[in-house]
Swiss-Prot record:
This is Polynucleotide 5'-hydroxyl-kinase grc3. One of its GO terms (biological process) is rRNA processing. Polynucleotide 5'-kinase involved in rRNA processing. Residues 16-30 have a biased composition (Low complexity). Its EC number is 2.7.1.-. It comes from the Eukaryota. The gene is grc3.
Length: 815
């Protein structure tokens, strides 16, 4: 059982058992006589009271529980009785005002049978907090501790008659004075009419172009700041846009309550001449208390050291080759995005020596949270225009006018730690593609985003990349070390004769979505986004995956469309391939050569395989193997043929591709590339067909086949697509609620709504909800009050030990 201790900067973290034993000894020594009422001095030496996550039942009287409930909570009550005298006084002395109880659990809860639950939220519900973390995703964060929503200042500009140029129900044009700013939540288009503004690192000048901005509450809000202008002010038009991304709230509660809520005071001022119920897709916020949904909103401000570093790096122009690394949650992605936008839109007044016409190359080596691709991929992208929004607003660049993905490789996991050899080979191949890109765009700088895998084996990979990729700069996003990371990076940078810049981290104070939830949001956005040929911006469709028309691909017979099905990781029996494939996410990989599988190395491992040499006897006993800088990046064995590795499953005749001993050897990055992801909706054994749902354009697959490439489906270790299983249920609930609203509105306005037809429609919609709730691998809990009470009791009875990510770190996590 864990206990929670206060986070102390000076003391090193201790185990829960040691902390408990120390407290027991102190209690025995301090209380030889019967316990007396403790004084104020004594309370300071005792463990702090638990700041538990609030629940609707927290303030309700305790209810009698059944024997079954007592069995589940017996362990908690026994642990709680032990320090009863210790707990009473701290709970009286330390008073915290609880946050507003979340009221998102309205009708039911849907989740996987494994115990992962997804809360059911009403779309128009104005109260409550953001979507809570699932049981599998719960963690201690600063978001758990604040009691009230702080009145945090957002905008430095107050709208009035003098700075409002014009406004209507769709558009707002304002003047922003120099060094003042405006914060807007929602999604909108920005048109700079006069002056120069800064937005997420980009400096935008007057032009006829509109820039699409996505500013949800899941991330810090972009700040529109006037840099210079005519008569000391810039004139900016902000216009509502209808991309359809808000429709995803009907498919997942993770997309609910992330855009603008009711009209703010600034909105009401600018909508005086509009219809009474007019609403834009954005809202102007002066402070965080202006938000009707009472969320913890913060502006996206940069540290001065960040701004100086971005300006210094931008001055290198086309010679820039920067690797950005650091611990998890230190702001690597934010810094990369700001640097990218700054390079794509330099200010001519301050940087006359550099004019970017060749774009910027973005090498994303983070398969867990990629910027322009779905999870599980690393890629090289060529950007030509700044981007304004979180990753789930641009999960793919396919068909985009702002940039293209030059080449991508499927890692098949959110972390490269399971197969670092393949990861390094893929990164090296992408770097070779960048060098080839320089032939067409010689002044194209490069930004490399490295994942938070910076300790242990990840540090070895990072130092190898620093020595091998021909970089110009290395940026480490933490001033607090640790030394065992910074020193090897500094030595590698010194060996490569490049500077190592250390910047302060900029972690998020409040977290409304966990990393797993953000990955689900990005994956869901990826599968629902489309780019029509005649539209310059993406659109999102709210049709559930179960109602999307799939691609039907033959996996056997004369019209076989795929060469094989590969399962990364440990070998499985061919009889289990059907179960492993059905309902999973797979990478669609184009194989450029029949011999595209890396051969099996007799001495596996990172230091012995691709990146290092054979260790000496003295090195074999050490934990950290020494890497050989001169080792050439080549496979350790000849490539194997795909056809020779095919084994047909006995019942379904599926082409199981496996080469290796114990674990499957991956595809060679130099002879293959990833086209995207697909969801295997079903396996039609009778027709020997796979039903695939994928956003990959049919023209890309057709072009790959016309070039003689084979298609291989790679089943990796990506997160289960739980969001796809529950989409139909949430869509059915949203449709039923819209119908209920329509009926209520008709009755209120005394309009004949056709009672018989309404009742019939309502019955059909309720039946749709009933059928959608019977999806396999999903359980709908209609009454979850008991579950909430049990969870609240568990939270109150637990003391969690909060550990630092590393010595001197302000963030928390596994160390």
């Amino acid at each position: 059982m864990k206990r929670k201790a206060e986070k102390q900067q000076s003391a090193a973290p201790v185990s829960a058992f040691a902390a408990r034993k120390a407290r027991q000894q102190a209690q025995i020594a301090a209380t030889p006589e019967p316990v007396k009422p403790p004084s104020a001095v004594e309370t300071t030496e005792e463990p702090p009271s638990k700041k538990a996550r609030t629940s609707p039942e927290e303030d309700t009287p305790s209810q009698s529980v059944s024997p079954a409930d007592r069995v589940q909570t017996r362990r908690s009550s026994r642990r709680k009785a032990e320090p009863s005298e210790i707990e009473k006084t701290p709970r009286r002395k330390t008073k915290t005002t609880p946050a507003t109880p979340p009221e998102h659990l309205t009708d039911g809860t849907v989740g996987r049978e494994s115990g992962i639950q997804t809360p059911v939220e009403e779309v128009s519900e104005p109260e409550g907090n953001d979507v809570p973390l699932d049981d599998a995703d719960r963690y201690e964060s600063p978001a758990d501790t604040p009691a009230l929503v702080e009145a945090f200042p957002l905008s430095k500009t107050r709208l009035n008659k003098s700075n409002i140029v014009y406004s209507d129900e769709h558009t707002l044009c304002v003047r922003i004075k120099e060094k003042l700013s405006l914060v807007v939540i929602g999604h909108y288009d920005v048109w700079v009419k006069r002056g120069v503004i800064s937005l997420m690192g980009a400096k935008l000048h007057p032009s006829p172009r509109l820039y699409r901005v996505y500013a949800p509450s899941t991330h810090s809000l972009p700040v529109i700041k006037c840099v210079s202008g005519v008569d000391g002010a810039a004139e900016v038009e902000i216009k509502s846009c209808h991309s359809g991304i808000y429709r995803l709230r009907d498919l997942s509660p993770l997309y609910q309550r992330i855009w603008n809520g009711s009209n703010t005071s600034a909105d009401k001022l600018t909508l005086k001449n509009a219809e009474p119920h007019a609403r834009r897709t954005f809202s102007v916020l002066y402070t965080s208390t202006d938000d009707s949904l009472k969320r913890h909103l913060r502006p996206l401000h940069l540290e001065k050291q960040w701004s100086s570093a971005i300006k210094s790096l931008s001055q290198k122009g086309g010679k820039l080759r920067a690797l950005i690394c650091g611990p998890k949650g230190s702001g690597k992605s934010t810094f990369s995005r700001y640097l990218l936008n700054h390079l794509l839109s330099p200010a001519p007044q301050t940087e006359p020596s550099y004019c970017n016409t060749d774009g910027v190359a973005f090498l994303d080596l983070d398969p867990g949270q990629p910027e322009f691709a779905p999870m599980g991929q690393i890629y090289l992208a060529h950007l030509r225009s700044p981007v304004f929004g979180p990753p789930f607003s641009h999960p793919s660049l396919e068909g985009s006018q702002d940039g293209t993905v030059i080449r991508a490789h499927h890692i098949g996991a959110s972390s490269p730690k399971d197969d670092p050899d393949h990861y390094v080979l893929a990164a090296t191949d992408l770097m070779d593609r960048y060098r080839a890109l320089l032939a067409s765009y010689p002044q194209c700088p490069l930004i490399i985003n490295y994942p938070g895998w910076i300790f242990g084996l990840g540090l070895e990979v990072a130092t190898w990349l620093v020595r091998s990729l021909g970089l110009s700069d290395v940026i480490y996003m933490s001033e607090k070390g640790p030394a065992e990371v910074v020193e090897p990076l500094g030595q590698a940078a010194a060996a490569a004769r490049i500077p190592l810049t250390t910047l302060p981290s900029q972690p998020t104070d409040f977290v409304s979505r966990s990393s797993a939830q953000l990955r689900s949001m990005q994956m869901q956005s990826y599968f629902h986004m489309t780019r029509p040929a005649d539209v310059s911006t993406p659109l999102w469709l709210d049709q559930p995956m179960s109602r999307t028309r799939p691609f039907k691909v033959h996996y056997a017979g004369p019209h076989q469309g795929i060469r094989g099905i590969m399962v990364m990781g440990s070998q499985i029996h061919p009889d289990l391939l059907h179960e492993a494939l059905d309902g999973s996410l797979v990478g669609v990989v184009a194989v450029e050569s029949p011999n595209a599988i890396l051969g099996h190395s007799e001495v596996p491992g990172l230091a012995n395989g691709v990146m290092g040499k054979q260790p000496s006897p003295a090195e074999e006993g050490s934990e950290d193997a020494v890497m050989d800088e001169a080792t050439e990046m080549v496979p350790t064995a000849p490539l194997a043929s795909i056809d020779s590795g095919i084994t047909r499953s006995p019942h379904e005749d599926l082409p199981y591709l496996f080469v290796g001993a114990g674990s499957c050897n991956p595809l060679d990055p130099k002879a293959s590339h990833c086209l995207g992801l697909a969801l295997v909706r079903s396996v039609n054994v009778a027709a020997r067909q796979l039903e695939l749902v994928t956003p990959i354009a049919a023209s890309r697959i057709r072009d790959a086949l016309q070039q003689g490439y084979g298609i291989v489906l790679v089943r990796g270790q990506l997160d289960n697509p739980n969001w796809a299983l529950s989409e139909e249920y949430y869509a059915a609930r949203a449709a039923e609620k819209r119908h209920r609203r329509f009926v209520d509105s008709s009755r209120k306005d005394k309009v004949d709504d056709g009672t018989d037809d309404s009742a019939h429609t309502s019955a059909i919609l309720k039946d749709r909800i009933r059928r959608a709730s019977h999806v396999p691998w999903m359980t709908v809990i209609e009454d979850n009050s008991r579950r909430q009470r049990e969870a609240a009791q568990r939270e109150k009875s637990l003391w969690k030990l909060r550990k630092k990510a590393y010595p001197g770190s302000e963030s928390e996590g596994d160390w």
